[in-house]
Amino acid sequence: MHNYLTDLTDNQWQSIEKFFDCKRKRKYELSAIWDGILYVIKTGCQWRMLPKDFAPWQTVYYYFRQWKYAGIIEVILEEVVYKIRESVNKSPSPTVGIVDSQSAKTTAVGGFSIGYDAGKKVKGRKRHIVTDTLGNLLVVEVHSASYADRAKGFDVISLAKDKYKTIEKVFADGGYTGSLIDQVKQKLNCKLEIIKRTDKGFKVLPKRWIVERTLGWLSNDRRNSRDYEFSPLTSEAIIQLSFIKVALNKLFK
């Protein structure tokens, strides 16, 4: 029996239990499997280094892969976003999004979609996210860091618009200027509003700080301190799980 800070409480697990087949008898409870995944994400340890009081690492990793490819993690993300919005009397589906990106170094593991971000001087991948005005993670796309924000901005905004069709406006920084504004308007029937820096020095910019705070939340998990994954899809699942834990902590304080 383990008792780590990353473990879900009974209330937290019960809120997402319906997404799993818990009726079939198993050697290891699915809640314990989930706890093992969260431990890896929080501590940044290798799967093979998972403490022995969890299920065998092979079992934990197997279920992580299954839930990733089955889309269960993504569905749970939508559920917790809905519940947080409902808890503050917001409509279930947002009308406003905020887009931003974060470049992360990759490791010797290598993998797909790795490039060089000349602006940040980072070799690795870029995490592109869209949040709502509460900072809830709506969508994430991980791709090579070599792509400029405006080059991949349409893709991630399109993902958000496809999942949350009520989105009418998206806020972004100056990296998303140019033809992207017209592209978003014409193809997605959505307004892209650019918030630019107007002076030097530190200044909290409207809306921008919200998405930057979310990126900060995600960075609290050591697995996100760099991109350790071979596949961008795995990186996306790790980020989704990181926010799910943040959301569950908010919902069940």
Say what each PLM segment does.
Residues 1-253:
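Short alpha-helical elements
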